[in-house]
Amino acid sequence: MIYFRIRVEVHIKTKMTEDSLKLFIQSIAEIPADIAIIQLNQYLGKLTEENRKIHRINIKTLVNKFPISWCKKDENKYLAPTFKKGAYIDYLTSIANGYKIFQNPDYSPRFQLSQIPDFDENWVRITVEDFKEVVMNRNTNGKDMYNLSYDKLKTVVDSVANFVVSKYNEILEGEGDLCDEWCSSNIHTAFKGGNPDDIKRFRPISVLPILVRIMDCILASKLHAILIQYNIIDTRVQKAILRNSSGLWENIFDVNFKMCKMMDAEDTSKIFFFIDLANAFGNVNYGTMLYILEAHNFSPKFAAYFRRYYTNICGFYRNRKFKWNNGLFQGSALSLILFIIYIDFILKHMFRDMKLSGAVQLEYDLQENTYAFVDDIVMILDNDEKNEARMEVINRTFEVYGMKVNSEKTYFMMYDQTIQSIQYSNRMEYNRAGNDFLYLGQHLFVYENDIFSNIMENMLRCLEKIDRLTLSHGIKIYVYYSKIFLRITRVIEIHYIIRGNHVNIQQIIQMITHYLTKWNIPEAFMKKHLEYLGQKGGAKIAKSPNLRKYMPELNIPESIIDDKALEYEDIFGQSTPEYESVDENLQYLMKNEREEFYSDFYSSI
């Protein structure tokens, strides 16, 4: 396995062209790591000082030649797949073609929505303003498979907008097949962690042609507005669709709040199930998705576009083309919205069947006790003899829609700590969530001591590294804010609200205060550091329709405002005198030839 340090660019003093260098890197990727490293060192050793032409090749951009992705191991490095590209294409194709396409799903009994709004089908019509808004608000510099970039498009947006928008609307009005160029996508691999030799640990990420991506974003935005306006998605359950509040924050808080209450009260009557769906996006069935879109009566034009587009998509992985017959794009705004609609429909079906089958009492509020954020699902159920029947309904319902619950990654939590696993008669076995389990990227707060010990150890190392830099205080504060504060603030906010103060929180605050006052943050402000965090978290609860019910229990006043929290953000999030934009701030270290520190700093967080 060949590893490359995170965010380190390859600086090669050579006359090799960029394409030649890509081919060289590709060639060493196909051989064992020890031999590849020897060859790379030998090659670099032959370079002479006379070759002054510098090629700055960012490893992460070598997409088709040498796909690499984020590795969540302790060393935090980019990881290159060792398997041949043909093997990965075979894997993607097997996923895509492994499920029957249900032209008209045979539900038994068939599930139907209780309410279907009457939409104006012209909501899908795209305007010039829609097009310009998407183009001008994108800051990415990368080029698509046809060598088009947003930067280039911005320079000609006024002259091409009318033409492009007219073609978009022609596509939506049309009935014929879409061309291959429109339905093509480059596929990158993103390592999900775990065993790097397991081909399933590399997630396929789609990079659409830019003009397709723009239409994709416009339709996603319009569809999102429809979902919110007509309350189509059950936002008590699915939080990924929320606006003006953080659904991620809400779910992390709510699940941990109820779990901590269960543990504190020694309540043995409840059990939490963290449900993992195997290859969730890849198992969305096109026929079923089309049925759901038609059941919602969104728009015949939109449903027709879905059919014409998704039934013709093909991917390019390392310049080899393949086609699949199931699965939504990961990396597509529209696919994300469609997936949320798909999961919402499944959960509504599941809730009905759980009550009709008697697995759950009719009065049990499944909406109140189910939390979804895209495909991350938590269900709080009664811990009794009907657990097996409930899990059977859950598994069966997902299977109807072409999905599968991954029992190896579905965990539970209950008060009785002597129970480490549960096995049912259908051979499904579920393990207890441990202190290394992550829900939405966050450790469970019942393991608070482990959480704070890890934070303190890593934070001290990072603060010391920032302090050693010969940079202005403003830059140091910004690096702290963007790369440390934003990673720990949610933990402290939520823990402070649920548990109150904690000795380790005080130690963390003292550690931060020592360095930030050294970097000219007012000491008087730092003394209220924790108060601001608590107020900020309280304001989030007060603003959330789903969490507002907890305000009396948590002693959060109705009059709470977050002006102080905003002041807090302003102090740490302000632009530095040297640079105005976020990107320029974060690139400061690179521009000052501190690549080695930059890499080491990132790898330690």
Question: Residue ranges of each PLM-predicted region?
Answer:
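Conserved pre-catalytic core of RNA-dependent polymerases
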Residues: 117-341, 345
